[in-house]
Amino acid sequence: RWWSARPTKTEYLGKTPLVVGPDLHMEIKLKAENPKSVGADRIVDCTYGYRKCKGSCIIVDFGTATTFDYVNNEGEFQYTVIAPGLGISATALTSQTAKLPEIEIKKPESVLGTNTITGMQSGVVYGYIGTVEYILKEMKKALNDYDCTVIATGGLGRVIASETDEIDEYDPDVAYKGIRILYELNKGVK
């Protein structure tokens, strides 16, 4: 990259920041094809999920993209699914059509829209619930791990998590908790 926040932050804080990446001491093992390609957000999410569950888990992070990251009972992160996020889906619907307006992403009162706005909200939200449920069921089947815990996080996760039994819990602070764990594991490591 042509830029870095590290020198500025180091000078400002008088401390060297903890840069999340595959070289940190971690409780999880990055078994992805290319560990350096695993984003910091996904590392901290999986760190927290594995620590909390003490076993296999899928962390669903509803961000710009929605990521479904699997950590097995041995703490190995190897498998992932990445889908367009709810916001991207809604934006595409608006930007790629002639007359559909921008919408607030929220669950409408009914799956049956009574106007363009509620019809779009229904399609985006309920369509996304279906996508999430299908991906989670297929992941569990492919992994032969039907008992893994599914934790949802991310700003729009609350919209989906409450609507499906495939998600065991929603926690908006997964990333912060994962960062804290990594900090504790690495604070004395040089």
Residue ranges and their predicted role:
Residues R1-I58, N73-K190:
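Nucleotide/phosphate-binding catalytic cleft detector across ATP-hydrolyzing
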Residues T66-V71:
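Short beta-strand scaffold segments in enzyme catalytic cores
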